[in-house]
């Protein structure tokens, strides 16, 4: 994270080491699990014994290596938006905890945890043969365990989580907005997200900018990019305002929003002025094009709907409202989730 603090956000290491003997299997897996969060992710080497360090050399752990790399690709919309933020503000992508939590003296000497962008705390396993990992959660907000149904912890404490070789300890920050590809991307250059899954954790009022362009040319300098501002506010009634601008037409056909709320269940969900259908059966929800479902296990609302900004004649106009609600080069729509108290028996 030191390079990011020094104004070079696109940092990264040669995964597995560039020279010298190949690392043992466990070390290589853990190295990849860390590397997938580095803006510059590269597995290559020139070993002194005329070998190379590549994933296919570790056949017993190939699935774990593949899983970590696929996670990186699913998080591509989040990473690309962080790259855009870095280009505009200089903000690091891999962030030392002290960058975000300067009022917590406990993070001043923390060297092995970091934030991936603003919202994801990563605590890679760094001890061989480890079965647990102690994680310090910075004070000032709540944290939600990515790997354990968003189990919630107060900040300002050290917790201990169980780990196996496949585990990458990750925690979402209260107020998080994390976009991911619904479809599995296999290439940053050739593949595009045809669906977006956005995980949100209401708490503090929050604004996030989701950025996209063609990823290849400099046409973004001519305005061929799309910036979608996502504004989340409210507690009993959470409103998420989407407002997009730009000339670039993305590929997103389907939207999915996952909203975590541990202390209350949802009452109703609306997209614009339309109240969405509530599905009690997960399979029926999965088969539907639009609606919402509540996971008792995660304590999270899952909302899905076709991207309302899709224009059949012009590809996809971005996350937005139906065509009559277009503004110049952009669209707006509001997703509302009610966590208000409700009376089932009319008393």
Q: Where are the regions that the model predicts?
A:
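Residues in intrinsically disordered, low-complexity segments of regulatory proteins
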Residues: 30, 55, 142-145, 210, ...
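Accessory, solvent-exposed terminal regions and/or long lumenal/extracellular loops of proteins
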Residues: 172-274, 283, 295-299, 304-311, ...
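Short amphipathic alpha-helical surface micro-motifs
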Residues: 1, 21, 76-81, 103-106, ...
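Catalytic-domain carbohydrate-binding cleft regions of carbohydrate-active enzymes
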Residues: 1-167, 172-173
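Surface-exposed beta-strand edges and their flanking turn/coil or helix-capping segments
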Residues: 23-26, 46, 55-56, 108-111, ...
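Solvent-exposed beta-strand/loop surfaces of large extracellular or lumenal domains
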Residues: 146-165, 268-302
